[in-house]
Amino acid sequence: MYKLIEGDDSKANEEEVTGDPWTILPVKTRKYAKECIEIVLSKRHITKLVKFNDFENLEALWLTNNNLTEIKGLETNFRIKILCLGFNRISSLEGSSLNVMKFLETLYLNNNKLKNLDKVITYLSQFKFLKSLNLFGNPVAEEPEYRPRVVDTLKSLEIFDRHMVTTIERIKAEKIVKEFNDPLSKKHVKRPKRLKVYENFSLIEKNLFNEANQIL
């Protein structure tokens, strides 16, 4: 089995730049491609992945620091276990090549443009073998109770955002998420704004108004 490493291309290009694994093969044969298990195509300004079909035994793919906006072109690479896509421009996971990677164990999506945490973790919940995940630096990381919601949903995770997931953390996360999802939780119930006419109330009316607010 072979491991191919290529990167640090200093030439930037704002136009379409394809990530073609064949360009870095020292021996350009189908046999060599079939036996290749790891490819590194980082820092190459890639905007589109092409010609990965013959790399059917690929297990690890590094695509960090590129210009990818979607995860497409890996539909035949179902054996991938490690996929690193940090520092790209990916905004959605739905309809991506990730769908075929049922054995995925490590997924780095840090510093992308992923939004809507509920959609992201619902999508990622299909990966039963996922052990290490990085979503740091995405808009989703700014959402309320970000880490507890991810930890509670993705039961197989051992490392999240470069930090170990402990049993104690899982127990706490479950409680936090339960409260977060409870529509009756005081933390999420918006109190009505005080009416401007309050100052014109009589003393009795003000007392009644305050009692009503305490009940709410």
What are these model-predicted stretches?
Residues 1-62, 67, 75, 79-84, ...:
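Long, contiguous C-terminal flanking segments immediately downstream of a protein's structured core
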